[in-house]
Amino acid sequence: MTESFPSTSASSQSSARYDPIELETRWQKEWLRQGLDRTPVAETNQKRFYALSMFPYPSGKLHMGHVRNYVITDVIARVQRMRGDAVLHPMGWDAFGLPAENAAIARNVDPGDWTDQNIAQMRAQLDRLGLSIDWDRQQATCHQDYYRWTQWLFLELFAGGLAYQKEATVNWDPVDKTVLANEQVDGEGRSWRSGALVEQRQLKQWFLRITDYADALIDDLDELTGWPERVRTMQANWIGRSHGAEIKFRVAGVANSIITVFTTRPDTLHGASYVVLAPEHPLVESLTSPEQRLAVTAFCDLISQLSVKDRTAEDQPKRGVPIGAQVINPVNGESLPVWIADYVLADYGSGAVMGVPAHDERDFIFARSHELPIRIVVQLPDTDEHHNDGQAWTGAGVLVNSGAFDGLSTEEAKVAITTHGASEGWAQSKVQYRLRDWLISRQRYWGCPIPIIHCASCGIVPVPQEDLPVTLPRDIDLSGKGGSPIAQEQAWVEVKCPICGEKAHRETDTMDTFMCSSWYYLRFADPLNSQRPFDKDIVDEWLPVDQYVGGIEHAILHLLYARFFTKALHDRNLIGFKEPFNRLLTQGMVQGLTYRNAKNGSYISPELVSDDSDPRDPESGDRLEVLFEKMSKSKYNGVDPAVVIDRYGADTARMFILFKAPPEKDLEWDDADVEGQFRFLQRLIRLIDSFAWPKTDGENASISSANLIIDSADLSEEEINMRRATHKAIEAITEDLSGDIQLNTAISELMKLSNSLSGKLDKVRNEVAAEALSVLVRLMAPFAPHLAEEFWLKLHGHGSIHQQSWPVIDPSALVLETIELVIQVKGKVRGKIQVPANADKKTLEELALNSDIAVKWLEGQSPRRIIIVPGKLVNLVP
């Protein structure tokens, strides 16, 4: 039931005194008082709609990337409310992690206090944007009432065999002094957070078996038709499913010693001239000969200092040393040397590859560098020619120099050789994945404690659920000197085993913060549940999320982990769906104007550039490059949202950021365009000011009653045109806000409608004008919610504009009495004529032939052919 809203006697503004701060603050208070943004209890048969932005890390400072993300989601949420849906639009905070811990170390403060302070600051900044967020559902991952359930879910995964601990070679960040998952190491071998070159270390770590879901994660991408193709491709490539064969090479002279390699090209087995192990392969130590021991040890030490990118870069030389062992090629009995090389990685496949230099580029480069044999076994198709000596032939073809398999095509040979090897026990078909199990251990303080106890007698023991949450100790030393800070807190570490009662100790690693963000969308549906993380029936009503909005940089981190979590929880019968997000919108970056000195790579503050038309470095005088790049402090190109809102208001900021570029494209910040949106809103104010209802029995009529049944039989031409423009706008904007969302073109349609109404409201009946303004204000409400509310009040609308129904097209208003018909002569456009909209082909032919255009251009000739495209053109061919 709608509560009373301010009457028309309440304050309203004209363009002459438009004060956006006063207006927006007033309406935000009113919305809060009315509780308009709370998630309603859905009525019977009412459709639910879940709109969600990727929740932010609470840095304490809102940036324009945040603004774009949250405003896009807010528009979608507001539209769906007006369409009659029960809408869930929550917000929370991804609040654990290294930045807060590092800030706490630098400032000697508690990271919890620091984080809560930042949350309060950012919430106040978000409130200024007029976002229709249900703050009653707010969650922060660092709060005990949230991470209790992260621990509960970890124990569910542990009980299902999906969480385990093992010794592993891990990615160590020497700056942040913690372990990183593979996904958190960039293509240059650097930490995604600190930028440090990542090192390799052996540590006992906790993992989640995401690889158990590799096939489901890649196969189900086909069902995500509401996701950008680019994101689906990135995930498929990261999972990296390859079909091939495992080949067993027996080590010569060593009983029961086998080197197993995975290859996608078993057809090239006859061309193998060596086998290569990763330097970290467990057999390197035992198979290295005494003569090669020093060289192998030195090489392994060298490789341990290199990043993955350095080891696998195509433009780098391929380095390696022989270890002094030989293996036997099972298909032909040849003896092949065993090497170690930088380009073979321990965590891909078996950590061993067969070198086939004639048909693999890396093997070719390696063989040329180390004078190893290059044997061609695949001939180019449909030719007697082999590949050029200067490169490997990696394509398909026909087998040669392959014994009984000569003449087979590549695909035939893959099957035949694998089948033959399987019959002899040295080969089997195999599917291999690039994806590795998710490493979740972190050796830092500010994270969710892993709810595990280690007992000398009982082994790994889960913390009983009734003892959750395992809370972080407070007031501890956060020196940042390596290792887990909580490992030094003996009073916290030492506990009794829940099973045997003997002395035991807690797990001192904390969880990767992506654990917390892999399920938060579920908690929003049931945020106050004190018995479970969520109720299955409730989440099944609201989820999957209908529209998820966030950056593409999360394609193979958060989005992949969230999909895994959803599938795992489904299999534990905790939820009834297998994918978390039905539709995904990945908004582009907000870029700022940047001045860069190309000679030295330095960035120059715009404040130091005296002439925009000829920008120069103030010190060197060098001409500067003018670029648009992602906003950052180091590039002096950031724009503070608070400054923009203080000057122009939230509605202007929203309109600019939505209009400037399609949501999935990068947006170039332009102060002049911000000013342009401010002027447009002022024009709307003047338009609304130009209309006034007549007095009726001392009362102002209401625009709500103007949802109006309009008799189209006796409308004037002006009225027909106004109704057509109004309903064309409904049609276009509704289309723009459905499916692939195009917010920029929706605002463009708003501008068209505004222009078509300007100066014409007094030329039509009040009912027609009121209908047009009612539609205009409702269409603009999701974009500029404060001004729309003000307009609705001024036009005597009942209740809030945001409680009104989305406008519906009147098809009769779109019917044209006449249309414009193009006249062509010999295919060239010669003019246009007006014809009845329902004219048949015969009528169109007569009208075209009798037109002045035809008389002029046919010059008395009769056309041999007449081509008619109804509703578009007539082509006369003499």
Swiss-Prot record:
Position of sequence motif 'KMSKS' region: 630-634
One Gene Ontology molecular-function label: ATP binding
BP GO annotations: leucyl-tRNA aminoacylation
Gene3D superfamilies: HUPs, Isoleucyl-tRNA Synthetase, Domain 1
Domain of life of the organism encoding this protein: Bacteria
The EC number(s) this enzyme carries: 6.1.1.4
Catalytic activity: tRNA(Leu) + L-leucine + ATP = L-leucyl-tRNA(Leu) + AMP + diphosphate
Single GO cellular component term: cytosol
Keyword Ribonucleoprotein: no
Compartments where found: Cytoplasm
Residues that bind ATP: 633
Top-level EC class as recorded in UniProt: ligase
Extent of motif 'HIGH' region: 56-66
Keywords per UniProt: Aminoacyl-tRNA synthetase, ATP-binding, Cytoplasm, Ligase, Nucleotide-binding, Protein biosynthesis
Similarity annotation: Belongs to the class-I aminoacyl-tRNA synthetase family.
Name of the protein described by the UniProt record: Leucine--tRNA ligase
Organism of derivation: Prochlorococcus marinus (strain MIT 9313)
Taxonomic path: Bacteria, Bacillati, Cyanobacteriota, Cyanophyceae, Synechococcales
